[in-house]
């Protein structure tokens, strides 16, 4: 069988770059395979994806050597239009992919360009939407859909093209746990029904491995450094060395000194249950529970907060919440549960229907957005949506300039904040020269100028690889030690487990759980009601038959935090 994607000694260098982004790339993907291409940020995996779908060389210019064949043809000798018939791409940013005003218009876009007759077009669009179970949404605007639904509509559009290769660019990056599971199941269904070749660019290893991949290709510093089945990749212990995360239950087994020389540790069901149980019991007996510090002073108190949009049912109903100084709280729940609405109510964008918000006992419910914004800051998921100035120094000093601080005061304050955030060496850099992670820290630096007491972070680690994820969350932990409180809106259960002090779960506008993270995420009923994903760590404990999984999670998290100095 001939490969459908073939790279041999392929090197690519952007026109403006001093060094090649891809060097001596060689691999083959065969028809019908499901393949993951993974690597940390900046590894070259996105450039490789662009070489597959034709964006290189037709949208991004550069110089290449070596051989590349997609469906038997060299894409450099054709056109991006021809390439799009062979390779269908689903972008990480779904909104950037939509053309039509309604779902059916968007799915019909390719067919319209092919001048397909209208009657036939309607049938193809209807069939494509039925294949992905989105036919009842055909008249809706794409922008009214959830992240998972948008991705599904994009896939329906690709099915109209009959492309043999489906390329997914970080398909799980912006999805809640339920939508991520749905997306993976949808990929499986499409593969089983149509035998498409599926190529995925992703660094969320644990989730995407559920797709039953045929092959994993690891990229680092522009080179292929490993290739094999998921089992072979996990057995090699290479993932942590290149800044990617192993499944958290495998991390746990290694921390427990589980001897896996004669065991296959992936998937979990292959483990010897009795051996796992004994190792966990022995480890637990040696552990000492950390003495819990008394809670800090109360910072913010929310009482009976309700909110509804005009002519709609309540989005928040009788929400009661306490936040303490220096505390990191995870705000969890599926898309539409009310997390963003609650955040917008705290910062004053939403005018609450009833209820009260108090800061250290003072009622701030009637405060203006500007006044409230000086003590409660909101950091968006995408840093590019917040940054307005051309350089790092100008961005951080912007608010101080508006408040008429003197040049000397601005210089001293900004430089101090940049040092705290690890950005002082880059103070004169242009914004476009910063990495994504540096931009995330820059948005934090900008809000620190007002000395906020509480910072709300919306999906702070979305789109970041594990190395930058750990770096950013350690930075947040250090700020919390200085007394700043954080509310972290996240779909990442591992982040909640490892870095937050408490978890609050919203469901249909109501708080259904508010407790320590290991109590909340160890509660199966809460997870099911809120459509949250159970951590593989709790699955491991259930698999082992150990009683009191919450107890193990408490001991394990205490241990990891001691090791990391958190």
UniProtKB/Swiss-Prot annotation:
InterPro entries attached here? AAA+_ATPase, ABC_Co_transporter, ABC_transporter-like_ATP-bd, ABC_transporter-like_CS, ABC_transpr_CbiO/EcfA_su, ECF_ABC_transporter_ATP-bd, P-loop_NTPase
Q: Does this UniProt record's set of keywords contain Cytoplasm?
A: no
Question: Main site of residence?
Answer: membrane
Keyword list, A-Z: ATP-binding, Cell membrane, Membrane, Nucleotide-binding, Repeat, Translocase, Transport
Q: Where does ATP 2 bind?
A: 333-340
- Coiled-coil intervals: none
Any one annotated GO CC term: ATP-binding cassette (ABC) transporter complex
**One Pfam family, short name please?**
DUF3744
What is the E.C. number?
7.-.-.-
Q: Name one GO molecular function term.
A: ATPase-coupled transmembrane transporter activity
Domain of life assignment:
Bacteria
Q: How does it sit in the membrane?
A: Peripheral membrane protein
The record's listing under SMART domains reads: AAA (SM00382)
Tell me which residues bind ATP 1: 39-46
- Record-given protein name: Putative ABC transporter ATP-binding protein BC_2655
**Occurrences of domain ABC transporter (ranges):** 5-246, 300-533
NCBIfam families attached here?
A: PRK13648.1
Question: What is this protein for, i.e. what is its function?
Answer: Probably part of an ABC transporter complex. Responsible for energy coupling to the transport system.
**Family the UniProt entry places it in:** Belongs to the ABC transporter superfamily.
Subcellular localization, as worded in the UniProt entry = Cell membrane
Q: Which organism is it from?
A: Bacillus cereus (strain ATCC 14579 / DSM 31 / CCUG 7414 / JCM 2152 / NBRC 15305 / NCIMB 9373 / NCTC 2599 / NRRL B-3711)
